[in-house]
Curated annotation (Swiss-Prot):
Entry keyword set: Melanin biosynthesis, NADP, Oxidoreductase
Root EC class: oxidoreductase
Pathway: Pigment biosynthesis; melanin biosynthesis
InterPro entries: NAD(P)-bd_dom_sf, Sc_DH/Rdtase_CS, SDR_fam
UniProt name for this protein: Tetrahydroxynaphthalene reductase
Catalytic residues as annotated in Swiss-Prot or TrEMBL: 178 (proton acceptor)
BP term (GO), one: melanin biosynthetic process
Region (Disordered) residue spans: 1-21
Family: Belongs to the short-chain dehydrogenases/reductases (SDR) family.
EC number: 1.1.1.252
């Protein structure tokens, strides 16, 4: 394919950042860190980043075997990867994780803060322990991942935080703690996009709707009236018909593809934004 040339502008503000054409979507030569990458959405993020040319640091807290499988799969697909164990609920672990990541591959271009926990419960029943469990990972953890990302990312790096449509959706019962923990991330992104602009780092949030991971059916049942009586297939049918005009359910790859867009040159003019990825469930 012939090289695509950039038009000659009259001032420095006319210069187009990065290549034109399909090359602008490439992640070749980039290094990414994905937290909570041993399973679910984080696993697919790591896999897709690897497929597109990234070297990937696969973070995990407990699932050693799963994380090693992700690393092996990325290598099999032709890129490189390594595991780093760290609990993002512990700031000292976060600091060490970033230091190890840079030692392994020499730099960081992309950080995907994916780790999270889910919680359901009527506000009258929420204990201080449950509140702290959720906010420690979903909110405090993401903040300090972002802090260390700023310190270690290359100029022009990418920080992608994990939100949820529950941070915006109305009338979600028994979900105040989880929704609040994710809603804070949206404010983080808007403020951090300003703070991190001095290093030309973009900061965005992906906010998934229901995504079919290992927790999918159990979580969906909390949203569906009498959901506890439905089979997994019936849950899928309900979700596809009631929650999306596209009549299908969301998959981890749907999130990973948007993450890769934000991580590439194509996403370079997007910052401080919350990207809802829910198949039209929240319009």
């Amino acid at each position: 394919m012939p090289a695509v040339t950039q038009p000659r502008g009259e001032s420095k503000y006319d210069a187009i950042p990065g290549p034109l054409g399909p090359q602008s979507a490439s992640l070749e030569g980039k290094v990414a860190l994905v937290t909570g990458a041993g399973r679910g959405i984080g696993r697919e993020m790591a896999m897709e980043l690897g497929r597109r040319g990234c070297k990937v640091i696969v973070n995990y807290a407990n699932s050693t075997e799963s994380a090693e499988e992700v690393v092996a799969a990325i290598k099999k697909n032709g890129s490189d990867a390594a595991c780093v164990k760290a609990n993002v609920g512990v700031v000292e672990d976060i600091v060490r994780m970033f230091e190890e990541a840079v030692k392994i591959f020499g730099k960081l271009d992309i950080v995907c803060s994916n780790s999270g926990v889910v919680s359901f419960g009527h506000v009258k029943d929420v204990t201080p322990e449950e509140f702290d469990r959720v906010f420690t990972i979903n909110t405090r953890g993401q903040f300090f991942v972002a802090r260390e990302a700023y310190k270690h990312l290359e100029i022009g790096g990418r920080l992608i935080l994990m939100g949820s449509i529950t941070g915006q959706a109305k009338a979600v019962p028994k979900h105040a703690v989880y929704s609040g923990s994710k809603g804070a991330i949206e404010t983080f992104a808007r403020c951090m996009a300003i703070d991190m602009a001095d290093k030309k780092i973009t900061v965005n949030v992906v906010a998934p709707g229901g995504i079919k991971t290992d927790m999918y059916h159990a979580v969906c049942r909390e949203y569906i009236p009498n959901g506890e009586n439905l089979s997994n297939e019936e849950v899928d049918e309900y979700a596809a018909s009631a929650w999306s005009p596209l009549h299908r359910v969301g998959l981890p790859i749907d999130i990973a593809r948007v993450v890769c867009f934000l991580a590439s040159n194509d996403g370079g003019w997007v910052t401080g934004k919350v990207i809802g990825i829910d198949g039209g469930a929240c319009m």
